[in-house]
Amino acid sequence: MNHLARILFFIALPAYGLLPSLAKSQTAKDLITPRMTQEASAPGKRVRQVAPEYEGTRVYHTLYLPTDWQKGKTYPVLVEYTGNKFPACGSTGEVKGANLGYGLSGGKGFIWISMPYVQKGKKENAVTWWGDRQATIDYCKVNLPRICKEFGGDLDNLFICGFSRGAIACSYIGLADDEIAAFWKGMIAHDHFDGQKKWGYPESDRASALKRLARLKGRPTLVCGNANDYLKDHPKLGTFTFLPVPVGKIFDIPDGPVIHTHTDLWAHRDSPTRQTARAWLQKQIRFK
């Protein structure tokens, strides 16, 4: 194409409605979760950290400081638990594979921590179910205040969140006793919820789950996706907001890393659903 033809081509584009779509494809980019590194913590970095109690083991958590992080300031915190290892949907079950918190925050304004499930024997993280449940609970109890103290996490604005296994963990781990339950300003659970069905681990029945949920004491909970509708029968336990997530409409699956409708990547693409979730989160912080 010679120079004159190239000019005429681009002059003609608006008449055919092509320039707006071209601009959209360039600006409406999906989020990409930062890769975990071994670096020192810094704004915009997601780093691997080992608690002093677990030095010499493969147990770790990840810490992400938002791009607008400044020393001496405080930030709300998203504490995430991952789904089980389930290759069919792309879930690795690993701490470093977490995505939901990054999608909800967009990488700014929130400290984001991905907590481990400590495997039995306390030598590594568990990628399926709970490992040593009490050790998992204790890890959060010890390390969440420690991280907040060092990096400016706002103890009055801690939100637990999770996908699949992690959605169940919001209650099964996060409301396991009064001490850990007292941390949370609210929770965000996507696809599944503690008590929706009975699984193969202890106290997964609904009666046990309802005892845990009593510790929620009416606090705000964003209930996203599927396998959680029994909560509609228990409105007094929490301030529940139900948010359907039409993954199949947000993505043309398979669509890049999204290979299944059961995914923690739904908030990585702009959509009315993501906008609703983020607005819900900001509202909870405003009404501190």
Language-model features: locations:
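A domain-start/cap signature at the N-terminus of enzymes
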Residues: 19-76, 110, 201, 245-248, ...
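Bacterial N-terminal signal peptides
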Residues: 8-17
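Catalytic active-site module of serine/aspartate enzymes centered on a nucleophile-bearing elbow/loop
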Residues: 269-288
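The feature captures the conserved acid-bearing segment of alpha/beta-hydrolase catalytic domains
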Residues: 179-273
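Short, solvent-exposed loop/turn and secondary-structure capping segments
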Residues: 73-75, 88-94, 123-128, 172-173, ...
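Gly/Ser-rich "nucleophile elbow"/oxyanion-hole loop immediately N-terminal to the catalytic nucleophile
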Residues: 69-73, 125-164, 178
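Active-site machinery of serine-nucleophile hydrolases
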Residues: 77, 81-142
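Short glycine-enriched nucleophile-adjacent loop
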Residues: 167-179
